[in-house]
Curated annotation (Swiss-Prot):
<feature type="binding site">
    <location>
        <begin position="175"/>
        <end position="182"/>
    </location>
    <ligand>
        <name>GTP</name>
    </ligand>
</feature>
<feature type="binding site">
    <location>
        <begin position="221"/>
        <end position="225"/>
    </location>
    <ligand>
        <name>GTP</name>
    </ligand>
</feature>
<dbReference type="GO" id="GO:0003924">
    <property type="term" value="F:GTPase activity"/>
</dbReference>
<keyword id="KW-0132">Cell division</keyword>
<keyword id="KW-0498">Mitosis</keyword>
<dbReference type="InterPro" id="IPR010674">
    <property type="entry name" value="NOG1_Rossman_fold_dom"/>
</dbReference>
<comment type="similarity">
    <text>Belongs to the TRAFAC class OBG-HflX-like GTPase superfamily. OBG GTPase family. NOG subfamily.</text>
</comment>
<dbReference type="GO" id="GO:0005730">
    <property type="term" value="C:nucleolus"/>
</dbReference>
<keyword id="KW-0547">Nucleotide-binding</keyword>
<keyword id="KW-0131">Cell cycle</keyword>
<dbReference type="GO" id="GO:0005634">
    <property type="term" value="C:nucleus"/>
</dbReference>
<keyword id="KW-0539">Nucleus</keyword>
<keyword id="KW-0342">GTP-binding</keyword>
<dbReference type="InterPro" id="IPR031167">
    <property type="entry name" value="G_OBG"/>
</dbReference>
<keyword id="KW-0690">Ribosome biogenesis</keyword>
<comment type="function">
    <text>Involved in the biogenesis of the 60S ribosomal subunit. Required for normal assembly of the mitotic spindle. May be involved in both centrosome-dependent and centrosome-independent spindle assembly programs. Acts as a TP53 repressor, preventing TP53 stabilization and cell cycle arrest.</text>
</comment>
<feature type="domain" description="OBG-type G">
    <location>
        <begin position="169"/>
        <end position="341"/>
    </location>
</feature>
């Protein structure tokens, strides 16, 4: 875990916003009403409070900014040098120093004007002193506009810096630009560093994390370094130099054997020699990358001699690798981690605290008193168990998955071959089938198939001889007539069913039966033709009952035979109900509004009086009409909720 968390630094507002925040806070958090009729001591206290409150807000906010930013003398030298490279140490200290000076100036302004407010003799004079005090504070902060802007940019950049723990196990990758450093860190960690085929793709430090031997390791990818004096290096290169100089880590120096990075092997070796002082007292590994393009054996003799010369130094291992084919990548990582672990242990052994740790562990070895060999006593059962376990370890059988991979499509899963408790000749016997507790095999005859063939042969002979042939039926005239009538009945039934289906499919409103009776499609002619088609003699049926008059309720017509004759209009005293064939009208009940009324004049007068009474009732009760039966809320909640106080009793 890192010791520094730069993301917690509070936002530094611009000068204008800084002043607005402070003055707005004063306006919101202090009293705002004062009158000239108040005692002068109260007026002085009112404006003194505003000046002191504003000064305290400025003081607290500036102190927060100064304390949040790291002090270069207190942080780790790595972060101190990195901030010097990125932000210019002098400029950084100057900005914080000027904010500290502004804080003291604001305090002095408040002190002076509070002293003057003690002698204010009117509301106007006290108000002007307060206005002057706040104005001078705002002027002081306006002059810090450039410092506040600079510190905000530093804060944003600090919050975007990777979290690097200077005391953790670290691997640093360095070398010329475009030699494969970012590709290597992407392979061994979960980092996602941009990789492009041009120089200086990586412009800042990138950190990835990996695991080795259940320990956490941080891998730092540095920008490319060019071979020129330290004074001429730019900010990008100086970040790598800072990491190499201050972090106690294992250094991986990458070289491009194919020279596709734009630098020859001689230049890469020269850079290695020039920055070698930075590798002092650090584990160092030379990683030769891109062997998938060119191997050391394919190099000319003079270039191969350069690699051979590097390999002569036994303290610096030279390892070959390729990030494209992932050849040697994990070997380089393992070697770097092992070297750093041994280096850290060696460093701890040199400290004074190591004696206290070593004294806790002590292995006592007895001194031999004679030459007699005293072997440890191991029980026979224990040794036999060890031998048995060794035999089991040697007797490793093939798994079904391995057999399947060898045989491919010819493989079939055989689960019975490992039934060691069953004899081999009985291992593949068919398992008997049981039905309702009975073994089916017990009811199967050995000659059942022969008997089945014999039965089939006998049945074939019977069919050929006509045993199963159905005799032809001789139908007389009566039976034929019955069948013909039955056929017609079935046809008629099908027609009626289809008509019903078609009528039900019509997308029309359904009329209730009591509103309009269903008029069936019947007529005298249709009846006569149907009966004649069935063989019935219909001659002499002109005066039959079915030919007499019937009332048509829909059209007010009388059907005489197949013709329709208009009905005579009924009198008022007669009923409008169905007129039977007898011609006797049915009397309807008299209307209720005419009961007990002698003549037409009295009837009209009664109608006018009823209409007036109904209108009066509707208006007075607020009804919508004569038939309005709406009942509203009888106890409105806003009038009947809560306790009944003394002053509310007149409302209920």
């Amino acid at each position: 875990m890192s010791l520094y968390n730069f993301k917690k630094i509070m936002v530094v507002p611009p000068a204008k916003d800084f002043i607005d925040i402070m003055l707005s806070k004063t306006q919101r958090k202090t009293p705002t009403v004062v009158h000239k009729g108040y005692k002068i001591s109260r007026i002085r206290a009112f404006y003194t409070r505003k000046v002191k409150y504003t000064q305290q807000n400025f003081h607290d906010r500036l102190s927060q900014i100064i304390q949040d930013f790291p002090k270069l003398d207190d942080v780790h030298p790595f972060y101190a040098d990195l901030m010097n490279v990125l932000y210019d140490k002098d400029h950084y200290k100057l900005a914080l120093g000027q904010l500290n000076t502004a804080r003291h100036l604001v305090d002095n302004v408040a002190k002076d004007y509070v002293r003057l407010l003690k002698y204010g003799d009117s509301l106007y004079r006290c108000k002007q002193l307060k206005k002057a005090a706040l104005g001078r504070m705002a002027t002081i902060m306006k002059r810090q506009a450039s410092n506040l802007t600079y510190l905000e940019q530093v804060r944003q950049h600090l919050s975007r810096l990777p979290t690097i723990d200077p005391y953790s196990r670290t691997i640093i990758i360095c070398g010329f630009p475009n030699v494969g450093k970012s590709s290597f860190i992407n392979k061994i960690t979960r980092a996602d560093v941009e990789v492009q085929p041009y120089a200086f793709t990586t412009k800042s430090l990138y950190v990835g994390h990996t695991d080795y031997k259940y320990l956490r390791w941080q891998v730092i990818d540095t920008p490319g370094i060019l071979d020129h004096p330290l004074e001429e290096r730019n900010v990008i290169e100086m970040q790598a130099i800072t990491a190499l100089a201050h972090l106690r880590a294992c250094v991986l120096y990458f070289m491009d054997i194919s020279e596709q990075c734009g630098h020859s092997l001689e230049e890469q070796v020269k850079l290695f020699e020039s920055i070698k002082p930075l590798f002092t007292n650090k584990p160092l590994i030379l990683a030769i990358n891109k062997i998938d393009i060119l191997t050391p054996e394919d190099l000319p003799e003079e270039r191969r001699a350069i690699i051979t010369k590097l390999q002569e130094d036994k303290n610096i291992p030279v390892m070959l690798m390729s990030t494209v084919q992932e050849t040697g990548v994990m070997e380089v990582k393992t070697e770097a981690c092992e070297r750093l672990l041994s280096y850290r242990v060696d460093q701890k052994m040199r400290t004074k605290k190591v004696d206290n740790i070593l004294n806790r562990l002590h292995v006592a070895m007895p001194a031999p008193r004679d030459d007699k060999l005293r072997a440890p006593c191991i029980p026979e059962k224990a040794s036999a168990r060890l031998l048995q376990n060794a035999d089991k370890a040697e007797r490793k059988r093939k798994l079904e998955k391995e057999i399947e991979e060898e045989m491919g499509d010819d493989y079939t899963l055989d689960l019975k071959k490992n039934y060691s408790e069953i004899p081999e000749e009985e291992r593949y016997d068919i398992i008997p089938e049981f039905w309702q507790g009975h073994n089916i095999a017990d009811y199967i005859d050995a000659d059942i198939f022969d008997k089945l063939e014999e039965l089939e042969r006998e049945e074939g002979l019977r069919e050929e001889s006509g045993v199963y042939k159905v005799p032809d039926m001789t139908m007389d005239e009566t039976l034929k007539e019955i069948r013909e009538i039955a056929k017609q009945i079935r046809g008629k039934r099908f027609e009626l069913r289809d008509e019903k289906r078609l009528s039900s499919r019509k997308n029309k409103p359904v009329i209730p039966r009591n509103k309009q009776p269903k008029v069936r499609d019947r007529s005298v002619q249709k009846l006569v033709s149907t009966m004649e088609g069935l063989g019935v003699d219909m001659s002499g049926s002109e005066n039959a009952n079915f030919t007499k008059s019937v009332v048509d309720l829909r059209r007010g017509q009388v059907a005489v035979g197949s013709k329709k004759v208009p009905m005579q209009p009924l009198l008022d005293k007669e009923s409008s109900a169905v007129v039977r064939k007898t011609g006797q009208p049915l009397k309807r009940a008299p209307s209720r509004d005419t009961l007990g009324i002698k003549n037409l004049a009295i009837r009209k007068k009664a109608q006018i009086m009823a209409k007036r009474d109904i209108a009066k009732k509707v208006t007075s009760r607020g009804l919508k009409g004569e038939a309005d039966r709406f009942i509203g809320t009888k106890m409105p909640k806003h009038l009947f909720s809560g306790k009944r106080g003394n002053g509310k009793t007149d409302r209920r």
